[in-house]
């Protein structure tokens, strides 16, 4: 799978945020997008995910425009960890990780026992299995960031897009994530 961004432009009102952004990324390749606050990194990620429509240019996965993907097909290709997350409901950490399957299963389908076991394995690997039954509004910012990583891993997409994934993490967890 190749992610290809070509001559991407995006503006908020009349303010250009992205100007002629182009790059390619192959499966397994790690790319860091660096820059000061407000430069457009999150906007770029939203364009990659098809959340925002660029003014000009294209985003393609394996030669196909992201706008041509169904939600389910795009979820198989891209998983996203936002830089901040304010949960609207107090789902458990385990349920929040299992939500990584919602694009594949459908909103109201229940995960299988094997999927729940896999979610617990992911929480264990991230060092937060003890939080599985805790409400996600009652965990720290760093624990919430690890939960979001778990959700993205549960999604099992080909490409992981992380927007400041270590901002809330301590040094040890930051090192493990990267």
Where are the model-predicted features located?
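Conserved structural motif at the start of ABC-family nucleotide-binding domains
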Residues: 3-5, 18-20
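The feature captures the beta-strand-to-loop junction immediately N-terminal to the Walker
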Residues: 34-36
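Helix-to-loop junction immediately C-terminal to a conserved catalytic motif
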Residues: 49
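Conserved ABC transporter NBD signature motif
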Residues: 57-65, 74
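Conserved ABC ATPase "signature" region
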Residues: 98, 113-131, 156
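Conserved ABC ATPase signature
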Residues: 135-139, 143
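Catalytic Walker B motif of ABC-type/P-loop ATPase nucleotide-binding domains
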Residues: 160-164
